[in-house]
Structures are given as C-alpha cells and as structure tokens.
Amino acid sequence: MNRPSGRAADQLRPIRITRHYTKHAEGSVLVEFGDTKVICTVSAESGVPRFLKGQGQGWLTAEYGMLPRSTGERNQREASRGKQGGRTLEIQRLIGRSLRAALDLSKLGENTLYIDCDVIQADGGTRTASITGATVALIDALAVLKKRGALKGNPLKQMVAAVSVGIYQGVPVLDLDYLEDSAAETDLNVVMTDSGGFIEVQGTAEGAPFRPAELNAMLELAQQGMQELFELQRAALAE
C-alpha cells in the first residue's frame, strides 16, 4: 500500500495551530491539517436561547461553511442558494455536539458561545480539523470570559480532538486527505476526549462492508493519532 502523500499508514499530516488569528473574536485559530485549512472563531454573547432562560446555564452552538473556491472547482455560496445543504447541517451539528461535551454548561453562566468554522482550503478532513482547532479557540475564549468575570467557575471539563481513519487499499490508515478519502473502502470520523472517551464515531463503508476486526484496528489507529493531536493542542496553548 502506497499513500499518495508518501506517509506511513499511522502518520498524521503536518499539523499547525495558529492562535489569535483574527482580531475581534474572543478566541480564534487557523488550523492546518496538511493542505486543509480552517479558520475557527469563538464569539461570546450575553444571553441564552429561550429554552434555557432562567436556568442559570450557558449554551454553545456551531456553524460551518466553505469558501466557494476552497475546493478544486468553485461551489456556489449556500447563502446565494437560500439554504444550507444537508452536509453543512450535519457537520455543524457534529461540531456543536463535540464542543459541548468539553464543557460544564452550568459554569458558563447565561452566556452563549458561537463556534464558526470556515474552510478556506479543503483537502479532506475539514470536520475533524474544525473540531480540533475550535477546541483551542474555545479555551482562549473561556480565558477572556474569565477575565471579564462572566463565568461561575472553570467550564472546561476536558480537551476534545477529532481525526479521520479509513481502509485504503485494504489497509487501515490515519488522517485521510482528499485523494485517499475519495478512494477509501471505509471512512470513519472519530471524536475523543483527552481522558480517552469517545464522543462520536461516524463510519461508512464505501467500497465493501468492514468487519469488526477492521473497525477495531481503525479505532486503535484513531486513538494513537489522537494522542498526538492533544499534544499539539497543548503545545499551541503553551505558546
């Protein structure tokens, strides 16, 4: 098995997390998984959705989008089409669920955090890059809210990261790029906490059904890659 990038089966793409990437948001990063690049911002606003009013807890929600020419051919903006596509809705819900798992919302006060993930260049793994980068931006945003005295305590329960794994040419591989993803027999997106818990596992057999042994091999590979991602997040936060 030869990966198009020349990477080993268990090798992540070069990953870079640049903090404080934009001026106005409480937290922001540019996250790069190889040639996939996503700007993740976290904005804090006072108040919560109607269903949470008066309960003394906060909320987190997410939006996701891709620039028209983030891919090989230009895609029409969803705003000009008048509605979001099913893929966009699925991904932004995944991002929201994943980041809420990192927080104790009762310590957020009646504040809402808006996660915005905008893909400026796509080469596979945009949702996993978004979750990994948005976690760092979220931690920076919480530090800003703490300085403002807006928090009841430390809402952060755990770090969260995500990575893709798949079966490519019959072999489990880590962190698929677009060429691999397009030809993979199986594709999984895995979201985990730094304590080793799984938040979400999304898996689809594209070429042939996968067997329990292959699923276990992919999950083990994801866990291995996740440890590297948590180290990269911590290193970025230490800068």
UniProtKB/Swiss-Prot annotation:
Phosphate binds at R87, G125, T126, R127. Keywords: Nucleotidyltransferase, RNA-binding, rRNA processing, Transferase, tRNA processing, tRNA-binding. It catalyses: tRNA(n+1) + phosphate = tRNA(n) + a ribonucleoside 5'-diphosphate. SUPFAM superfamilies: Ribonuclease PH domain 2-like (SSF55666), Ribosomal protein S5 domain 2-like (SSF54211). One of its GO terms (biological process) is rRNA catabolic process. CDD domains: RNase_PH_bact. It is an enzyme of class 2 (transferase). Homohexameric ring arranged as a trimer of dimers. This is Ribonuclease PH. It comes from Pseudomonas paraeruginosa (strain DSM 24068 / PA7). The gene is rph.
